[in-house]
């Protein structure tokens, strides 16, 4: 497989990740820019709070699908480990979308899609951590930060190889960076708690 094909599939994965699902849903449903409402994020949590649970779930499914597609693109090329690079490219696209002038979401739902396609130890660990932290605190942001941070450790303890550990570190670092405003609000006691009602 040529280097050009590898570069092209990584670029395509970035573009897939860049599709701003929540932004497009909000534009279509209410004609609004979701970045000007609620937390200002384009992700599923803010869509849920702004437009309601149904559209929030639609945003979650769409963003998760981007991660799945990116991994499948990487595997289709047949280069070992390429699915980790295409997965990382999708996360980068979601976080810094070319369609939104390199603004974007916080990568959690797209990370879910990527992890669904990788060895299950990280997904199982991150999901358990996310559910536990959300149940205890009702802070989606805190649950997401801690869950993302558990991914590299889960891969390391699961013995799946150094490439997966490096990918997990990338995922965790980007997730924490994208949640820096949430971290500031958490420290100040100003972060909003999640409710299953709009």
UniProtKB/Swiss-Prot annotation:
The gene is plsY. Pathway: Lipid metabolism; phospholipid metabolism. SMART domains: G3P_acyltransf (SM01207). It is found in: Cell membrane. Its EC number is 2.3.1.275. It catalyses: an acyl phosphate + sn-glycerol 3-phosphate = a 1-acyl-sn-glycero-3-phosphate + phosphate. The keyword Lipid metabolism applies. It is a multi-pass membrane protein. One of its GO terms (biological process) is phospholipid biosynthetic process. It is an enzyme of class 2 (transferase). This is Glycerol-3-phosphate acyltransferase.
